[in-house]
Amino acid sequence: MNLVRETAPEGLNSLGLTLNTEKSYTWSSTAHGTELVYLGYAFKKIGGKADVSIAGKKINVIKTRLTKSFVRYAKDHNFDMLKMRVKFLTGNFTLYQADTLLPIRVGLFFNYKQATNTDCLDDLDKYYQKLLHCRTGKLGSHIAMSKLETKDLEKYSFRFGYENHVNHHFTTDQMDMITNCWL
């Protein structure tokens, strides 16, 4: 490991890059329960196996987007936009590269398909259901959704979208409208 620490800065410099020592650390995979977060995944050694899950920061980003979607709905009562935002977060969709029109599949499954532990999806589903059925408090009291609308949104699930690779279609304009409340 010392060899890496000694040679990495020199190798990076030759590429015109520098090592950010404030964000760099040595990870010991032998320490039980130690977690490495990299590229949206959390790697953890449990027993003799590696546990790969969606990183906590990414889960928090999804929860924040869900909350912001419901906050926007509480203000504008645009059910169709809320439904599109929920579909966007719980499912997958295809983008096309502008220059080649090659498809790029993105979304919950395609962004995290290397995860071996998907328990966090149940946590996301519980969080979503609490938001959906909340009728008290600062946010809940402003969500005036009919029973039919609530029932319509109940069918969306992070676990189902992930395991069944649920794919939705959104136009560019729709994606802009969906994501504008998360900025």
Q: What name fits each language-model region?
A:
Residues L3-T7, L17, S141-M145:
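Composition- and surface-driven signal marking solvent-exposed, interaction-prone regions
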Residues A8-G16, L132-L139:
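A generic secondary-structure signal for well-formed alpha-helical elements
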Residues M1-N13, G47:
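Catalytic palm subdomain of template-directed nucleic-acid polymerases
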Residues G16-E22:
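Conserved short beta-strand edge segments in small beta-sheet-based binding/regulatory domains
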